[in-house]
Amino acid sequence: MDVTAKYELIGLMAYPIRHSLSPKMQNKALEKAGLPFTYMAFEVDNDSFPGAIEGLKALKMRGTGISMPNKQLACEYVDELTPAAKLVGAINTIVNDDGYLRGYNTDGTGHIRAIKESGFDIKGKTMVLLGAGGASTAIGAQGAIEGLKEIKLFNRRDEFFDKALAFAQRVNENTDCVVTVTDLADQQAFAEALASADILTNGTKVGMKPLENESLVNDISLLHPGLLVTECVYNPHMTKLLQQAQQAGCKTIDGYGMLLWQGAEQFTLWTGKDFPLEYVKQVMGFGA
C-alpha cells in the first residue's frame, strides 16, 4: 500500500494497545477496498485522552476507535451520541465530520451479531453478563434492544458497580428487558443465575494476557451443556473460560466474532463502504 498525502487517518486510542488486532484487520480491509485511509494505533489512557481528542480535530482525522480504559470517558468529548450509546453510557467509535464528533458503540451490535451468526436466537433468553465496563454494558444494552428477557449482571464492588446500577436502571426504564446487578463475591447467587441461564458472556479483561490463566468461573460444574458461553477477549484466542466451557459441553463463541463484526460496522461508519468480510476472515484467520 502506497500512502499518499491524500490519505485520511483513522486511529485507535487505548491503553494498553500492543495486543490489538484492529490495526491489521482494518488496514487489510481498507487496502482490499482500495480506499484512501490508513489506520494507526495510539497509546492513550484517561489522562491523555482529552489532548488526544484535540489532536484528532487538529489533524482532521476521519475518526477513531476507542478501547479500554477510555470508552466511558469518551462520551464526554463528542457532540452527539446515538440512542444506543446513550443507553450504554460508553462508546467505541468516533466519526469526525468537519470537527463535529459523533459517538457510536459497535461492541454490542458486533457481539450480538456474532451470536446470531452462530444460529442462536436471543429473543426471550436470559443472559448472565460478567463486568460493567464499556464492552459489557454495550452487549447488555444491545441484547436488551434485540429481545433478551433478562440480564443478570455480576460485577465486583469496585468503581464500576455504581455505574452498573445506573446502567440497569436505564435499560429497565427504556426496554422490556429486566436487568439485575449482583456482587460477584456472592457465589451462591452466581451459581443460581448460571443454573437457569441460556447465555454466559464475559465482558471483562479476565482471561486476557497477562491474566490468561484466570477465569471468573471458579467451579466448572456450574457450566451446563445447555449454556452458550461467549467471550470478548481474543488474546489469547482460547481463554480459560472457553476451555472450561468446552470441557463442560457448552457451545462457545470466541472473541474473534465480536472483533470482526464490530470492526465491520466501524469500517462502514468511517468510509461509507461495505466491509470486505470474507476477505478479512480469510487473511486474519478468523473462523467466525
Swiss-Prot record:
UniProt keyword list: Amino-acid biosynthesis, Aromatic amino acid biosynthesis, NAD, NADP, Oxidoreductase
Protein name: Quinate/shikimate dehydrogenase
Biological role stated in the UniProt entry: The actual biological function of YdiB remains unclear, nor is it known whether 3-dehydroshikimate or quinate represents the natural substrate. Catalyzes the reversible NAD-dependent reduction of both 3-dehydroshikimate (DHSA) and 3-dehydroquinate to yield shikimate (SA) and quinate, respectively. It can use both NAD or NADP for catalysis, however it has higher catalytic efficiency with NAD.
Enzyme Commission designation: 1.1.1.282
Binding site for NAD(+): A132, G133, G134, A135, N155, R156, R157, D158, K205, C232, V233, Y234, N235, G255
Gene3D superfamilies the UniProt entry points to: Leucine Dehydrogenase, chain A, domain 1, NAD(P)-binding Rossmann-like Domain
Bilayer-crossing regions: none
Binding site for substrate: K71, D107
Gene Ontology BP, a term: amino acid biosynthetic process
Gene for this chain: ydiB
